Amino acid sequence: MKAGMFYCASQASTATANGERTVTARAIDRHNPIIKDGRRSFTAPCSSGDDYVAPYRQLSKITRVPSSSGDGKSVQVDKGRRSNSGSLMKLISYDVSLARKSFGCVVATPKTPPGSTRYLLGSDPVSLAGSTGQDTVATEESEASAPKRGSSGPVEEKKKSSGSGSDQVVVLRVSLHCHCRGCQGKVKKHLSKMQGVTSFNIDFASKKVTVTGDITPLEVLGCLSKVKNAQFWTPPPPSIPRANPET
């Protein structure tokens, strides 16, 4: 038995077939995520306007890009941001100008000309001192240096007078050998280093050493005793104490 397909050409049958097709198409659209996207839906839902909640993407669009129809909040946010940035820039510029003014006040010190009344009335104490202070300092230094120079004069004169009038002649007997040149060199070396000695003479034959200068006999004896045995040629006269005229 052969199976056959029968088609009905009536209007009722075609209506039912179209309805079934639309029903299946609606069911597919309802479950399709691409078609369900809010950006593709141009018609508002059938629910009331109070209960309608816009999708997240639409909310982001509203806040980011202000539209012409009733987006006052987004415009206010942008204006607030702009106003905040403007006030911040004004504050920064004001602080910079204030810092410049204060720096200029600190660095730039007012200078008074020498001929002004402030300069003459004592605004600058160092300038008031002027040349008078320098003159007084110079005079004080000259006065202080004058007695020093005057005092050095008598000291030098005393040295000259003592060197000329108080020279003593000391004669010693030194154990010198006639053929020993080393002994003679040692004696000459010690006498030349001795302070106050102006001249000396060595006689090998008589073993006599004569020393002249601002010295004492004991100093010469102590100096030559370091080299050779020495003694006074003639014993020095004993020092006689002077009598006090008041007694």
UniProtKB/Swiss-Prot annotation:
Record-given protein name: Protein SODIUM POTASSIUM ROOT DEFECTIVE 3
UniProt domain HMA: residue ranges: 167-235
Location(s) in or outside the cell: Cytoplasm
InterPro entries: HMA_dom, HMA_dom_sf, NAKR1-3, NAKR2/3
Any Gene Ontology CC annotation: cytoplasm
Organism, as annotated: Arabidopsis thaliana
Known role: Heavy metal-associated protein involved in salt tolerance.
Keywords: Cytoplasm, Metal-binding
CDD domains: HMA
PROSITE patterns according to UniProt: HMA_2
Induction description: Up-regulated by salt and osmotic stress.
Main location: cytoplasm
PANTHER family: OS08G0405700 PROTEIN (PTHR46119), PROTEIN SODIUM POTASSIUM ROOT DEFECTIVE 3 (PTHR46119:SF14)
One matching Pfam family: HMA
Any one GO MF annotation of this record: metal ion binding
Binding, a metal cation: C180, C183
Protein's UniProt keywords contain Glycosyltransferase: no
Top-level taxonomy: Eukaryota, Viridiplantae, Streptophyta, Embryophyta, Tracheophyta
Region (Disordered): 130-166
